[in-house]
């Protein structure tokens, strides 16, 4: 199986703070990987590292150069423009003519159930609509790898279900090729539904790397999660 990312003893420090320490692992094409751990465990830093927004300060990271990536944040940035223009901009920057980019943007918005808001200002949309718009913005670029940093954390239950359904749909890929999806989440139910593999981080260290079924085995979970961690209504806090 082709490795999209290979980390060897990778570390990231911000001054005296070790955000990641001695991280060694491979992520293969087509995997659906959940990053779990309490706040400050290194999940966001790892996503930024994989996306090229952060360089390792120790060790080595190898990434497949040809892979097209998209990253979604918990609170996506919206331009002061229409929803259609927000989606079209990435295509235009990739060399697509503006007219074609706008047509493809509308197809992307329809894909996430937002065709009716194409001409509305993106900043007037609800949080759930903005996150779906961000998914459309990524989808039209046909990424092979999608990185998501707690994309449903700030959404209401209905919007969470909508975005999660789209994540599952997108993770299935297109043209018979599954997309590689790596996402950070505190929601263990979401992890169980969407992931095939779980990386458990704490204080920048990888404590467990398990198939999702093994992670949720009661004995394994108890052995993996230190007693100081609390699980409240399916959320790891």
Report residues per predicted region.
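Conserved ABC ATPase "signature" region
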Residues: 99-117
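Catalytic Walker B motif of ABC-type/P-loop ATPase nucleotide-binding domains
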Residues: 146-149
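Helix-to-loop junction immediately C-terminal to a conserved catalytic motif
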Residues: 51
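The feature captures the beta-strand-to-loop junction immediately N-terminal to the Walker
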Residues: 36-38
């Amino acid at each position: 199986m082709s490795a999209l990312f290979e980390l060897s003893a990778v570390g990231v420090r911000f001054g005296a703070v070790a955000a990641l320490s001695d991280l060694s692992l491979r992520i293969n094409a087509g995997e659906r990987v959940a990053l779990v751990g309490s706040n400050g465990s290194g999940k966001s830093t790892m996503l930024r590292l994989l996306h090229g927004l952060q360089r390792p300060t120790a060790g080595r990271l190898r990434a497949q150069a040809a892979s097209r990536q998209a990253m979604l944040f918990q609170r996506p940035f919206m331009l002061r423009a229409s929803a259609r223009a927000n989606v079209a901009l990435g295509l235009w920057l990739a060399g697509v003519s503006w007219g074609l980019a706008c047509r493809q943007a509308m197809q992307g918005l329809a894909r996430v159930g937002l065709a009716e808001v194409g001409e509305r200002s993106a900043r007037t949309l609800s949080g759930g609509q903005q996150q779906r718009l961000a998914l459309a913005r990524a989808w039209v670029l046909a990424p092979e790898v999608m990185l998501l940093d707690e994309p449903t954390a700030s959404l209401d239950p209905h919007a969470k279900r909508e975005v999660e359904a789209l994540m599952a749909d997108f993770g299935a890929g297109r043209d018979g090729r599954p997309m590689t999806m790596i996402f950070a989440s505190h929601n263990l139910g979401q992890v169980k539904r969407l992931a095939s593999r779980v990386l458990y981080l704490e204080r920048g260290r990888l404590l467990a790397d398990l198939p999702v079924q093994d992670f949720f085995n009661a004995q394994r979970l108890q052995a993996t999660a230190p007693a100081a961690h609390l699980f409240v209504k399916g959320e790891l806090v």
